[in-house]
């Protein structure tokens, strides 16, 4: 633990908390700080100019990161008949109906995301207290309740991430791994920012994207100069 603390202190000394870093410099520094023995995730926190307490200003959605997430995802799908076959063909590890619901009730949840065809919500709806707290409840706003389950499965496998603003008005998301090239991380960040812009509530006033910060799993956070995000 002492070693981790010393390393963190060393990296913290390199970071100016008051400075806005150009995106290229920010990514380079975050990657440098990610020196743990595992492939650290690169995370972003975006402070939004919204009132998260108001239901009409809750920002939620999903985006497929062009360079993926660097994580293997196991997908469970509620579907039957032709849609079930399409889900399997698209790469879903688990496909079912009542049988899948019973597995979930029994605590057997060997998956990272749940997708449901609209006609299965009578079954899925009974699982809200189990899936909801785990962030696994299918929702049309993030594309996990859809008649096109095959595309939803492909998107999940391709690196789709879901986002939802927290009570403090902040979006937290992972945009890749420390092993990614800086260009790949930047591409993923740009895709996320674009998705957040599209999800801007009509009732949001003033500056919408207030702050953008990057960090690695074990590293320190640093702020990004948003003016450099648009530059290519």
Curated annotation (Swiss-Prot):
Any single Gene Ontology cellular-component annotation: cytosolic large ribosomal subunit
Pfam families, per the entry: Ribosomal_L1
InterPro entries, per database record: Ribosom_uL1_bac-type (IPR005878), Ribosomal_uL1 (IPR002143), Ribosomal_uL1-like (IPR023674), Ribosomal_uL1/biogenesis (IPR028364), Ribosomal_uL1_3-a/b-sand (IPR016095), Ribosomal_uL1_CS (IPR023673)
Molecular function GO labels: rRNA binding; structural constituent of ribosome; tRNA binding
Keyword set, alphabetical order: Repressor, Ribonucleoprotein, Ribosomal protein, RNA-binding, rRNA-binding, Translation regulation, tRNA-binding
Keyword 4Fe-4S: no
Tree of life domain: Bacteria
A single BP term in Gene Ontology: translation
PANTHER family hit by this protein: 54S RIBOSOMAL PROTEIN L1, MITOCHONDRIAL, LARGE RIBOSOMAL SUBUNIT PROTEIN UL1M
Task of the protein: Binds directly to 23S rRNA. The L1 stalk is quite mobile in the ribosome, and is involved in E site tRNA release. Protein L1 is also a translational repressor protein, it controls the translation of the L11 operon by binding to its mRNA.
Family assignment from sequence similarity: Belongs to the universal ribosomal protein uL1 family.
Subunit text: Part of the 50S ribosomal subunit.
Protein name from the UniProt record: Large ribosomal subunit protein uL1
Gene name for this UniProt entry: rplA
């Amino acid at each position: 633990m002492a070693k981790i603390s010393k390393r963190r202190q060393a990296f913290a000394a390199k970071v100016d908390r008051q400075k806005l870093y150009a995106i290229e410099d920010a990514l380079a520094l975050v990657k440098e700080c990610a020196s743990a023995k595992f492939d650290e995730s690169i995370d972003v926190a975006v402070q939004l100019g919204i009132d998260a307490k108001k239901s009409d200003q809750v920002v939620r959605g999903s985006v497929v990161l062009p360079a993926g997430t660097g994580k293997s995802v196991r997908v469970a799908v509620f579907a039957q008949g032709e849609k079930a076959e399409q889900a399997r063909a698209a790469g879903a590890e688990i496909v079912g109906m009542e049988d899948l619901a019973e597995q979930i009730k029994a605590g057997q949840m060997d998956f990272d995301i749940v997708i449901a065809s609209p006609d299965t919500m009578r079954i899925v709806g009974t699982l809200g207290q189990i899936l909801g707290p785990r962030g696994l409840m299918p929702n049309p706003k993030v594309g996990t309740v859809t008649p096109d389950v095959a595309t939803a499965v492909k998107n999940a496998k391709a690196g789709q991430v879901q986002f939802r603003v927290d009570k403090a008005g902040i979006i937290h998301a992972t945009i890749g791994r420390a092993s990614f090239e800086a260009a790949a991380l930047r591409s993923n960040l740009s895709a996320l920012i674009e998705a957040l812009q599209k999800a801007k509530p009509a009732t949001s006033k003033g500056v919408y994207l207030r702050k953008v910060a990057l960090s690695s799993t074990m590293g320190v956070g640093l702020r990004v100069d948003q003016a450099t995000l648009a530059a290519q």
